[in-house]
């Protein structure tokens, strides 16, 4: 098995996000109760966005993703979407191994990677057209 440092960015991000879900899993009912509270009072969630953003930046940096500049900002927003999409699967994942969560995270990361490549081409085309 490769060490985390020898893994691809995507593999490292998978490991970082799954570590987060493992932590959530240890206190599953508490986190689900907190989530249910946010559904009743969504304005409370807004107060946590700066902390969540910071935690996403740290997660990205642990996975050796550059989140600086314009491209990094887009990448960070994509990572947040991946995390939230996977979080909603985790809410319904009653397996002890979190296999549904792992499959969803892998699928979401694959989609994000494809979208990122597509977006890079679009940005390149726009730059070439504007020159």
Model region roles, listed by residue range:
Residues 1-33, 40:
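Hydrophobic alpha-helical connector segments
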Residues 2-6, 61-68:
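Acidic/His metal-coordination segments adjacent to aromatic residues that form catalytic metal sites
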Residues 11, 29-32, 46, 73-74, ...:
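Short, solvent-exposed positions on alpha-helices
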Residues 18, 22, 50-53, 106, ...:
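Generic structural signal for well-ordered, non-transmembrane alpha-helical segments
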Residues 29, 124-131:
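Extended low-complexity intrinsically disordered regions
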Residues 32-34, 68-69:
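Short, hydrophobic secondary-structure boundary micro-motifs
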Residues 42-65, 73-85:
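Amphipathic alpha-helical packing segments from all-alpha helical-bundle domains
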Residues 65-127:
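Hydrophobic/aromatic-rich alpha-helical bundle segments in the mid-to-C-terminal region
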């Amino acid at each position: 098995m490769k060490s985390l440092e020898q893994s691809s960015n995507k593999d490292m991000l998978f490991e970082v996000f799954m570590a987060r879900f493992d932590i959530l899993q240890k206190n599953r009912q508490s986190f689900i109760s907190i989530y249910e509270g946010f559904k009743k009072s969504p304005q409370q969630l807004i107060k946590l966005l700066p902390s969540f953003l910071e935690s996403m930046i740290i997660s990205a940096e642990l996975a050796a993703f550059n989140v600086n500049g314009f491209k990094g900002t887009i990448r960070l927003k994509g990572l947040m979407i991946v995390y939230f999409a996977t979080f909603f699967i985790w809410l319904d994942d009653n397996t002890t191994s979190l296999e549904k969560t792992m499959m969803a995270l892998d699928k979401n990361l694959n989609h994000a990677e494809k979208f990122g490549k597509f977006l890079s081409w679009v940005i390149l085309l726009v730059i070439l057209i504007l020159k």
